[in-house]
Amino acid sequence: ADSRKPI
């Protein structure tokens, strides 16, 4: 899973 989150 991607741990990147939109700002």
Curated annotation (Swiss-Prot):
Entry cofactors: Mg(2+)
EC numbers for this chain: 4.6.1.-
Signal sequence region: none
Class of the enzyme per the UniProt entry, highest EC level: lyase
One GO biological process term: killing of cells of another organism
Entry's cofactor comment: Binds 1 Mg(2+) ion per subunit.
Family: Belongs to the arthropod phospholipase D family.
Function, as annotated: Dermonecrotic toxins cleave the phosphodiester linkage between the phosphate and headgroup of certain phospholipids (sphingolipid and lysolipid substrates), forming an alcohol (often choline) and a cyclic phosphate. This toxin acts on sphingomyelin (SM). It may also act on ceramide phosphoethanolamine (CPE), lysophosphatidylcholine (LPC) and lysophosphatidylethanolamine (LPE), but not on lysophosphatidylserine (LPS), and lysophosphatidylglycerol (LPG). It acts by transphosphatidylation, releasing exclusively cyclic phosphate products as second products.
Name of the protein in its database record: Dermonecrotic toxin LgSicTox-beta-LOXN3
Organism in which the protein naturally occurs: Loxosceles gaucho (Spider)
